[in-house]
């Protein structure tokens, strides 16, 4: 046996270590490979380029509200294929597929809880559920959120992420634009704050109704916000749109939104704004997540 064969015979091949699926992910913007757990701790914001990735509705609400205070509302409401709609696929099959993929019954999740101890009702869209499209259940859950805010005499916060009205429900989905807007009029009559947070993307019938009706309309950085998409507009007007058209930075320059807030700063910023609007003490940034419950503001101010 030659010397090289003796060396080869003593070499033990090593097994390739298998990496569990989902441990690593890639940034949609800069392409940087990121550790999944680190990204979740950073609220789905890329630590390299500050790109705000899409966030599930439940993760968003859990990152906003105080621990142990969350109570889900309207979870019993489920969509039905009343029209027996079919395009390339049956609507009921699309619903079943979306429900299996996301674990949600529909595209809006509503919870009540506390924010730095202040009672609030919060709603968030699940974009992975049929593009966050608004159907009858989304409208009904949003109205339920408004009714709960009125009952508890507390503010309402909604995080929008939607492609617009759900075409599979035809006019029933379009009716939700008026239904949700009418419900918000009751909030205005009572003098209760409604803050709309626009995330990427907020389009179509959602942007044309409750998403732009906030007492404050706040957007995340670089969120796409509008009615029709930029490609549709370019094809219609036959002109090239300006850079960044329909992005939150473009909209704030034109006065269409009130402010842009980075996601890691969103919780404290919302609490600070609502404390001022509700005449409550400013939140303590060092306070534990469970907070200290503040009693609801009475319906009427005491007479002087």
UniProtKB/Swiss-Prot annotation:
Cofactor or coenzyme needed: Zn(2+)
Binding site for Zn(2+): 27, 30, 46, 49
Catalyzed chemical reaction(s): N(6)-carboxybiotinyl-L-lysyl-[protein] + acetyl-CoA = N(6)-biotinyl-L-lysyl-[protein] + malonyl-CoA
Region (Disordered): 285-304
Binding note for cofactor: Binds 1 zinc ion per subunit.
Gene3D superfamilies from the UniProt entry: 2-enoyl-CoA Hydratase, Chain A, domain 1 (3.90.226.10)
Example GO biological process: malonyl-CoA biosynthetic process
Stated name of the protein: Acetyl-coenzyme A carboxylase carboxyl transferase subunit beta
Gene that this sequence comes from: accD
């Amino acid at each position: 046996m030659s010397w090289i064969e003796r060396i080869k015979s003593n070499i033990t091949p090593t097994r390739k270590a298998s990496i569990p699926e989902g441990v690593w992910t890639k940034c949609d913007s800069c392409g940087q490979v990121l550790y999944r757990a680190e990204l979740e701790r950073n609220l789905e914001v890329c630590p390299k380029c500050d790109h705000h990735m899409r966030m599930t509705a439940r993760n968003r609400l859990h990152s906003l509200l105080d621990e142990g205070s969350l109570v889900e509302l309207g979870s019993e409401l489920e969509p039905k294929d009343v029209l027996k709609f079919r395009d390339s696929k049956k609507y009921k099959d699309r619903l079943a597929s979306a429900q299996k993929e996301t674990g949600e019954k529909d595209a809006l999740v509503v919870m009540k809880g506390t924010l730095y101890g202040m009672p609030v009702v919060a709603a968030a869209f699940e974009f992975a559920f049929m593009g966050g499209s608004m159907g009858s259940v989304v409208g009904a859950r949003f109205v339920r959120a408004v009714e709960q805010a009125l009952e508890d005499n507390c503010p309402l916060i909604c995080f929008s992420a939607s492609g617009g009205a759900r075409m599979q429900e035809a006019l029933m989905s379009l009716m939700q634009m008026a239904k949700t807007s009418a419900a918000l009029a009751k909030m205005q009559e009572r003098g209760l704050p409604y803050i709309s947070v626009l995330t990427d993307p907020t389009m179509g019938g959602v942007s044309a109704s409750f998403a732009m009706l906030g007492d404050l309309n706040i957007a995340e950085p670089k969120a796409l916000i509008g009615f029709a998409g930029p490609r549709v507009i370019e094809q219609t007007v036959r002109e090239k749109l300006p850079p960044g058209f329909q992005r939150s930075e473009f909209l704030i320059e034109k006065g269409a939104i009130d402010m842009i807030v980075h996601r890691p700063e969103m919780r404290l910023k919302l609490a600070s704004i609502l404390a001022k609007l509700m005449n409550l003490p400013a939140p303590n940034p060092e306070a534990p997540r469970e907070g200290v419950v503040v009693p609801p503001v009475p319906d009427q101010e005491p007479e002087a």
